[in-house]
Amino acid sequence: MQRRWGWLAMVMATLVALLGGSARAGEGVLEMRIYTCEPGKLEALNERFRNHTMKLFEKHGMKNIAYWEASEGPTAGNTLYYIIHHASREAAKKSWADFQADPEWKAVAKASEEKYGKILAKPPKAIYMTEADYSPASEKAYLDKSYELRIYTTALDKLPGLHSLLKEDGEKLFKSHGMRSSGYWTPTDEPKSGNTLIHIVEHPSREAAKESWKKLDADRRWIDAKAKAEANGKLLAVSPDTVYLKTVDYSPKP
């Protein structure tokens, strides 16, 4: 009987994660997709997602987690970023095939391109990801917050060291300076799986983000933790690739 209840508890925990406001990659696979639009076509893409695409994703077993646009920098005004959840990598493959073959999707895509012309400047970039063991559950995004996508590329064999730094010191120090992590993910496919960490940070505002990073960089606890972690060499091969994001109006509500 005890074993039976343990099994039921595990099933219920999985359902809560998948049906509620968050999803763990351990219960499936997460996919980040980045769409680059032709000049002036981002709102056409947003219209298609808002009115049709998200519903069709759910129809084919893909769970919408969060959607953003870049709020500044070279990708502002032409790029959509989003995260979806799949039951498994095989399920993802089937879902995308079924979605692409769906007559409803074909009609939507045809109608939007007849109305607006070519919308995407290039094929979408897809990154399948797994959560780090210290990551919060991937969750929906708030409209009134500022988000920051940070992509870290480590030096050779330094990804475990970066994980340790963030797990043991970084995360608690981020919180102490008003920054809240939405998730830490590692790509599942080589070569990125061995040297890349994807991190999204939630800030109360863009100005708050600037102030928080300034305070963190001056914090002796962070300076010492980083120096200790890099005693045998730099962790990062290059500076983090950073994009500030704003949540779009059709992103699932928390």
Q: What kind of region is each of these model predictions?
A:
Residues 9-18:
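Bacterial N-terminal signal peptides
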Residues 1-4:
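N-terminal secretory signal peptides that target proteins for export/translocation
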Residues 6-10, 106:
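Hydrophobic alpha-helical segments and their boundary regions
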Residues 18-224, 230-254:
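Short S/T/G/P-rich N-terminal loop/turn motif that feeds into the first structured element of a domain
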